[in-house]
Amino acid sequence: MATDPRKILVTCALPYANGSIHLGHMLEHIQADIWVRYQRLRGNDVNFICADDAHGTPIMLKAQQMGISPEEMIAAVSEEHQKDFAGFDISFDNYHSTHSDENRELASHIYLELKKNGFITSRTISQLFDPEKEMFLPDRFVKGTCPKCKAEEQYGDNCDNCGETYSPTDLINPKSAVSGATPVMKDSEHFFFDLPQFESMLKEWTRSGSLQTETANKMQEWFESGLQQWDISRDAPYFGFEIPGETNKFFYVWLDAPIGYMGSFKNLCNKRDDLNFDEYWKKDSTTELYHFIGKDIVYFHSLFWPAMLDGAGFRKPNNVFVHGYVTVNGAKMSKSKGTFIKAGTYLNHLDPECLRYYYAAKLNSRIDDLDLNLEDFTQRVNSDVVNKIVNLASRNAGFITKRFDGKLADNFAEPELYNEFIAAADRIAELYETREFGRAIREITALADKANQYIDEKAPWVLAKEEGKEQELQEVSSVGINLFRVLMAYLKPVMPELAARTEAFLNETLTWEGVAQPLVAHEITKFKALFARIDPKKVEAMIEESKEDAAIEMAAKEKAEAEKEKASQTELDKDPIADEIEFDAFEAVDMRIARIISCEEVPKANKLLKFQLDIGGETRQVFSGIKSAYKPEELEGKLTVMVANLKPRKMKFGMSEGMILAAGPGGKDLWILEPHEGAQPGMRVM
């Protein structure tokens, strides 16, 4: 008896909109996409959504550094993110942004509901404040010396050197990472979500049995240490949504970020008539909601998020699926080693389906870190996908197309073997459902081994040379093609592009239930190469490009730091005061007010302008090296200051009878001295 399709809403954690997608991000998105594609393959109604997390201080400051608005920056980043996800065949139904009208409305609604229900409190707190930038500083925007190990240049929340955690006020000699200024303490009213009121509900949710064991255990630790009120506000300047009814107060990015799941779905509902927002988010919804996230954000998704939803009258997630981190070659991803690999860099060199397969082969339902060993990656994909699975088709297709006009045998010669392959469907289905993808892949490759063993034993290449073996050759090759068909149906959630090419070859759409019966008397198309093996040289080229990208980024960062350091210097730091002189020496310099009668460029001189100056009854010709800062027509008629008793100097272009005074380091940064109104040509400057 057929059951109604499940209605499922699936989300991935929202990538932050200030940088590129890398292979660490791709683990989660590939994991979720495989699960979503499996559910769709089984006939379930799935909506798969995501968005960019587009608010917060880091985005505001990076946009300032780039000289563009935050809106311009997040739009460009969103375009890049969506291109990368599409490159890996991540089948989102909608990709949106937390900086959207839908998200603003929902964040305001949830906040006001929480406030109305008594879950929002306020109090005055003291925070570090940058007096130059006039902004409060998040922990990661304060640097100083670790109070424990005395390591310098440590962030305001923890020490990378010794691992100590502390308050930013504990740092020795704290400095603003934004301006370099010494921060001061300043009071401000902040708003808090009263999380402790939800402890009983959260404990019950934890005991539901659906959460991963590691997540439930971690939540128990948090319960034992005591839940704390959560600061959900930030002061201006801040890029985000203003809190309703408040002035210069904004929602902390982590309040509106998970609401972005709802905002993205709301945006999708506005595009489609068949979707109802309330059906999926109302308190008593019978639909299913699942979040795929990394282990670094469990706290927000397992405590704050379900509590916020419950307090505002919405449903809670059915589950939060947590994964570990990605390491490369057994170590943390490294820019200097070229193992911090951006998604776009990978796509420049390798087939995305290779990574999809490798991640699937190593994923399970636990919160384990996954190591992308590049040598093993190459060997496993080439061995499993090319040698075992795709080779099964290539070994048999030629006989069918050349000898039998592309037609499979009228009867199926190995029903028992085929039934063994079909019997594995329920086991593999359960493994997909429970996210035990690695075990599912092992089941599939074990079947591939059996299929290849059968072909090795029957040796169709030998049968092709023997008279009277035509029917057996067709039957054996047809068995091989059909077993390949079953394997590809099972692999379709993992390798959708390979599955699509297989469907074109088989002249049939692959479905989970459809492969229950073999293809007989069915016409296939001429075999074309379905999948290319990984060339180790392409892996090396990917690493080299990653190193080059890192070097360019480092050079740009160092340049920006140098410019920041230079900008923080005073003019006296840049150009210290000269040695003292006696008053008589100064008195010997005769400075006079001069009116610029005319100014013109000097032919063949890169820096010089030629001036005619009126100094009150006398005209002087002066050459001055300020061409890079001024156009001649900008200066004519202005008053300025000149040294009038400087000994005339004969130059290539004529006699210079004095010196015009200007301030600045040089180049375009030069400014002539201009007296106030009332000064007259010829007056002495005292």
From Swiss-Prot:
Q: Motif 'HIGH' region: list the residue ranges.
A: 15-25
Residues recorded as binding Zn(2+), renumbered to this chain, are 146, 149, 159, 162
Q: Which PROSITE patterns match?
A: AA_TRNA_LIGASE_I (PS00178), TRBD (PS50886)
Query: Which Pfam family would be a valid example here?
Result: Anticodon_3
Give the binding site residues for ATP.
335
Which controlled-vocabulary keywords does the entry list?
Answer: Aminoacyl-tRNA synthetase, ATP-binding, Cytoplasm, Ligase, Metal-binding, Nucleotide-binding, Protein biosynthesis, RNA-binding, tRNA-binding, Zinc
Catalytic reaction equation(s): tRNA(Met) + L-methionine + ATP = L-methionyl-tRNA(Met) + AMP + diphosphate
Task: Name the chain's protein.
Answer: Methionine--tRNA ligase
Q: Which intervals of this chain are the motif 'KMSKS' region?
A: 332-336
Q: Name one GO molecular function term.
A: metal ion binding
